[in-house]
Amino acid sequence: MGVSYYMGDLNPTLPFAMSQLEYGGVIRFNYNNRWTFRADYAYATVKADDKIIKWRPERELNFTSKIHDLSFVAEFNFLEYYTGNPKRNVSPYIFGGISVFYYTPFAEINGELVNLRYENPKTKTLRYTEPPLPDNAKWYDRLAYKSMPVGFSIPFGVGVKLALSKHMAATMEWRMEKTFTDYLDDVGTVYPEQHAKYIDVNGTEFDLTDPTGNYKPGQQRGNSAFNDWFGMARVSLTWKFNLPDGRGCNLSKF
């Protein structure tokens, strides 16, 4: 369990800004005293708001993305480490690997999260359909979304592990994920001619592409030269199960 954060078009410079809760689980295989291989699952939320981050407050954009992340990484212990050995019970480590994640971006309108992704197979435009809206709410067509709901990333980071008993260990780590998408925040390139608009149950119209109404098509909306990142800082507890050959496999929730 820990916190997750985002860095990208709305927040290019401030780690841990607007951090959110993240949680998940890990299965770890201790190959030897130096090398460990593991599979991680994490459910994380990342968000940013121009009015709070103030990198470009005049845009007045905001987003919240829900992320389901599955990664496979290798850890290298700087010191010989073995859970249950009082002489080898602590070590800093580094890790790296590959990750696949599913994400859904939302915009916040008057405290309500509006889903920014749905492609209509007939018109190749996006409409808001899930979760269901009231009958008198509408979603206007917008340009086809320029990303898939599934992304790939390279996770890497540093941490420290400490054996608490013969079978239990604790780890603390900081992790970054370099993604290959610029649409984790639904912001990229320039303002299009066709805007995403939402009308609430009271008939109030909101422009999700340009809330200010001050930008013309072709003006810069985001920075497409750099893809988005997200990171996590977490603490985990693991429990070691001995395999038949004596090697350990740590199963945990964090």
Task: Specify the residue positions occupied by each region the protein language model found.
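Residues on the lipid-exposed face of transmembrane beta-strands in outer-membrane beta-barrel proteins
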Residues: 1-3, 25-29, 72-78, 96-100, ...
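Repeated loop/turn-to-beta-strand initiation elements of outer-membrane beta-barrel proteins
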Residues: 34-37, 82, 167-170, 243-246
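Short glycine/proline- and aromatic-enriched beta-strand/turn motifs that initiate or cap beta-hairpins
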Residues: 1-30, 105, 230, 234, ...
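Residues that define the transmembrane beta-barrel architecture of outer-membrane proteins
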Residues: 17-23, 66-70, 90, 146-154, ...
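Outer-membrane beta-barrel transmembrane domain signature
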Residues: 99-228
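Extracellular loop and loop/strand-boundary signature of outer-membrane beta-barrel proteins
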Residues: 7-14, 56-64, 81, 140-146, ...
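Gram-negative (and chloroplast) outer-membrane scaffold detector with strong preference
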Residues: 35, 40-127
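Structural signature of outer-membrane beta-barrel domains
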Residues: 4-8, 40, 44-48, 99-105, ...
